[in-house]
Amino acid sequence: MNIFLDIFSFILFFGILTIISPILGKYMADIYEGRVHPSLKPIRYVEKTIYKILGIDESKEMNWKEYLYALLSFNFLGFLVLFLTLLFQKYLPLNQYHIPNMSWDLAFNTAVSFVTNTNWQAYAGETQATYFSQITGLALQNFLSAASGIVVALVLIRAFARKNTIYLGNFYVDFTRTILYVLLPVAFFSALFLVSQGVIQNFSHYKTIELLEPYKDSKNIITTQTLPMGPVASQEAIKLLGTNGGGFFNANSAHPFENPTPLSNVFEAFLIILIPASLVFTFGYMIKDKRQGWFLYSVMLFVLMLFMGIQYYFEWFGNPIVKKLGIEGPYLIGKELRFGIGGTVLFSSITTATSCGAVNSMLDSFTPLGGLVPMSLISLGEIIFGGVGSGLYGMIAMVIIAVFVAGLMIGRTPEYLNKKIESREMWSSVVITLVSGITALLLTTLALYTKWGLSSMSNPGPHGLSEVLYAYISTSNNSGSAFAGLNANTVFYNITTGLAMLIGRFIPIIAVFYMASSLSLKKHVPPSPGTLPTHTLVFGVWLVFIIIVVGALTFLPAFSLGPILEHMLMLEGVTL
């Protein structure tokens, strides 16, 4: 393991991202504006056939209420189908391992999780979900929930790009194009690459193999091991591309059947961040100001690399208690040796910044401040690239807040992208920014105040608090990753984390539509000498300041009692 090699790999990774994401962003802008390249005529034929079968008029656009109603209805139907599938999976096909039905609370939690693009997993995929549930339920929702997030971002983009109109697009058209032109093709070729790296793709029975080194437990000598099988590669690709994060196996992307090589690890991390980064450029192209796309990308990339550097430092130099025992080298507890510190930090930072939730390591085993980094990235509210779609509209809400505060300081009515920012936009932006944080803190308080919440904690002291806090920050921000020391498969946690996911997903979406309904009706205001430019270095510094301040004000007290206190105790050599 070499620090300089890791730094070089980070630079190469983000260099390639900076080259590819504008290209994909331009492609997506063309698709959503109806400019289909002649080479895509076969897909266009499929698209038209779908509209004909379903009776959809692609030329008819919707106002914000019609669009929102279609989106919410579609998501509710998806939840209902998935909930019933999990509740009765024992009786459905492709259940070679005779897996029983999920309990009602676990089925509710899992269905909500995948419909909201959170993919919080209170179950183990290899023992509690059948092949049928994985394919027709969970993998399907990986496509649908990702497309749902992207179309919400499209509505907000159009609200800025258009003027004096109530129409914001057609949900069914946007949704269909997202699936056909973006998610399916990229996921298909990504799955083929993952298979080439050793990710499995089959419908076989689980394999029983002889151990090379049998071992003895309290009762018997164990000589065999059962290896789970399944159609993993096809689900792995969309799990990452759609920033979903729910693994086929309980170990997620730390499992060698999901992520077998260092190359697959880098590729999977790239898949996670690809669409969130590209959508920023789609935004710039569709509003006819590419500078805005590059500006947002630069701010997001700066904050991500800052947090990555902090995490790398604490994980490389490790735990002083361990070093006192004469054990030198980087802190590898909870990490896969085939990835090392660099591959682990790259993956964990990207997956939490994008609110994906996939993990290639055990976050619960990181150093206190190393574990604070993913928690902090999630708690910023899905704005450092963020989930597909949700990251863009979350960042735009933060930009509007920054513009508003700057406008107050200079005594001008704030404007963003030639549109005046008034009470409706500010109200919506505040809701988008704060609702997940408030939800997480309230539910954490409830869990720590009740016996149902406390009974699931396996660790005392500040780390136990961190596990509970992380659970609700993760679910309310639709991330899905966890500090795994918490037993989340209880009625209390299944219901409360389910509510956190619903609130964190749909309240901001409603606020986005409310904002878009106002912006689309406004005319474009020509820039004046006093207009605040929102693509400059000065505004970038201001935006980063606002992002950090809002995040710190929301969670700093809770972080002080959790990971920060745990770090102080570690420096004193105290363990709990």
Curated annotation (Swiss-Prot):
GO terms for molecular function: P-type potassium transmembrane transporter activity; potassium ion binding. It holds the Pfam family KdpA. It is found in: Cell inner membrane. GO terms for cellular component: plasma membrane. It is a multi-pass membrane protein. The chain crosses the membrane at residues 3-23, 68-88, 137-157, 179-199, 267-287, 294-314, 339-359, 369-389, 391-411, 430-450, 495-515, 537-557. It comes from the Bacteria. Keywords: Cell inner membrane, Cell membrane, Ion transport, Membrane, Potassium, Potassium transport, Transmembrane, Transmembrane helix, Transport. Its main location: membrane. The keyword Membrane applies. The system is composed of three essential subunits: KdpA, KdpB and KdpC. Part of the high-affinity ATP-driven potassium transport (or Kdp) system, which catalyzes the hydrolysis of ATP coupled with the electrogenic transport of potassium into the cytoplasm. This subunit binds the periplasmic potassium ions and delivers the ions to the membrane domain of KdpB through an intramembrane tunnel. Belongs to the KdpA family. This is Potassium-transporting ATPase potassium-binding subunit. It comes from Hydrogenobaculum sp. (strain Y04AAS1). The lineage of its organism: Bacteria, Pseudomonadati, Aquificota, Aquificia, Aquificales.
